[in-house]
Structure formats: C-alpha cells, structure tokens
A protein has these predicted regions:
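Bacterial N-terminal signal peptides that target proteins for export
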Residues: 1-11
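Bacterial signal peptide processing site
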Residues: 25-28
Length: 213
C-alpha cells in the first residue's frame, strides 16, 4: 500500500510539474507575442512619421512652390500681352524658370499623382512638335479656341501632349537659351503660350492637391 501511495505521489507530482511547465511555456509565448507586437507598433509609428515628414516637408512644399510660380506665369503672360515691355517678358521668363526648377526637383518622386494621372508626360513631353504647332496655329478658329474664356481647357482638349507643358511655353519665351526680345512674339504664339501655361498651372495644382489632401 505504501508503494502504491508513492507511485500516486510521483504521478501527481509529475502531472503538477507538467502543468506548471505548460503554463510557463504559454506565459512565455504570450510575452513573446506581446513584445513582438509592441516592436511592430513602434516600427509602424516610426515609418508613419517618416512618410508624414516626407510628404509635408518635401513633396507638398515642392509642388506648392511649383504651382504658385505656374500661376504667376499665367498672370505674367497676360500682363505682357497687355503691356509688351521687356520687364514684363523677363518676369514671365523668371517665373517660368522657377516653376520649371521645382518640377525638376520633384522628378525625384514621380510616383503618385504624377504617374497615376499621367501628369509627367502631359507637362514634360519632349521634343516639342514645332511643325504641328505651326500647322495648328495657321487656322484662325484654332487660335480663337485657345483665346476664349476656357483657354486652359481648350489647350488640354485640343492640343496633344507634344504641344503642351513646359517645353511649349519655353519655345515661345526663349530663344537660344535667353529671353526673347519684347515685341518679337507674334500674337498667335502669345495666345498659345497663355493657354498652355494655363493648362500647366492646372496640372501643377492637381499635383499639389493630390498630395496635400
């Protein structure tokens, strides 16, 4: 009977330790999962902070400066059309170059709206199709379309992207890498430049709005 009691005692003791080890194992596993979850949450928070900083300290300010300068460009061109002085033309060239500079800086992050909405090729296709431009502007009704109230929409819908964007405006404003002389830009080309600059402005603001929310 004593031997049987010993056997029972050993069996109970073994069961107790077995349950204890299992409980410890479960506790350790739970602690490990909690620790890993905490680390993952910390990583996610760090990544979110990096992304937020990239968007609001790099992307948004870049597109904002580009958009503001593109808006100034349209105003400059309209002012030059009313008052064709060299100072007004130089101001348009200055704002064009500033907007273009910010666009070139943004080429480091052409993902997102620039690619999703096809804005990159829309405003930066090269080369400009000069023969097609001459042919288009040879028709009076085409010039009238670009000179209406919806001049920017007309540019977007009537012109192909080989006639749009920075290179289209640049062709009108500059010659041999320098601002053209005041009074040398034909009226039809000035109408074209204003319309294309308006479409360019719209695309720049679309980029900004897409990132800024």
């Amino acid at each position: 009977m004593k031997k049987l009691s010993n056997y029972c005692f050993v069996a109970i003791l073994s069961l107790f330790f077995s349950m204890s080890f299992t409980a410890c194992s479960d506790d350790n596993e739970d602690d490990s999962k909690k620790e890993e979850q905490q680390k993952q949450e910390e990583r996610d928070k760090a990544y979110a902070e990096i992304v937020d900083a990239f968007i609001h300290k790099t992307v948004v300010p870049t597109y904002e400066k580009m958009a503001l300068k593109s808006s100034e460009l349209v105003k400059d061109l309209r002012e030059y059309r009313k008052n064709p002085t060299q100072a007004n033309l130089d101001k348009a060239c200055e704002d064009f170059l500033a907007s273009r500079m910010w666009w070139e800086r943004s080429e480091a992050f052409l993902f997102g709206a620039a690619s999703d909405f096809g804005i990159d090729p829309h405003i930066d296709s090269w080369p400009l199709d000069c023969p097609a431009l001459e042919k288009y502007l040879a028709t009076a009704t085409n010039i009238e379309d670009l000179d209406g109230d919806d001049y920017d929409i007309a540019a977007r819908t009537k012109l192909g992207q080989e006639l749009l964007g920075y290179h289209g405006v640049e062709y009108i404003l500059f010659k041999d890498g320098k601002p053209r002389k005041a009074g040398t830009i034909e009226e039809k080309f000035l109408v074209y430049a204003i319309a294309v600059a308006g479409d360019l402005r719209n695309s720049c603001w679309q980029l900004l709005a897409s990132w800024a929310g």
